[in-house]
Swiss-Prot record:
UniProt key word Membrane: no
Primary location group: secreted
Keywords on record: Disulfide bond, Glycoprotein, Protease inhibitor, Repeat, Secreted, Serine protease inhibitor
Gene3D superfamilies named among the record's database cross-references: 3.30.60.30
Positions bearing carbohydrate: 43
Pfam families on file: Kazal_1
Disulfide feature: 6-36, 14-33, 22-54
Residue ranges of every copy of the Kazal-like domain listed in the record: 4-54
GO cellular component: extracellular space
Free-text comment on this protein's domains from its UniProt entry: Avian ovomucoid consists of three homologous, tandem Kazal family inhibitory domains.
Annotated site residues (Reactive bond 3) in this chain: 16-17
Protein name, entry field: Ovomucoid
Organism annotation: Pavo muticus (Green peafowl)
Amino acid sequence: AVSVDCSEYPKPACTLEHRPLCGSDNKTYGNKCNFCNAVVESNGTLTLSHFGKC
């Protein structure tokens, strides 16, 4: 399984860096920061499906 380290999150602001990730909710996140913030908000229920757009 693929995973990302979200231990440094959440962060108050994310850059506009474009490196899409696909979440287990079938949503495409613009970059790791956006994805990790969502993971923290979901209390860990959101996971990484794969790198790239969904």
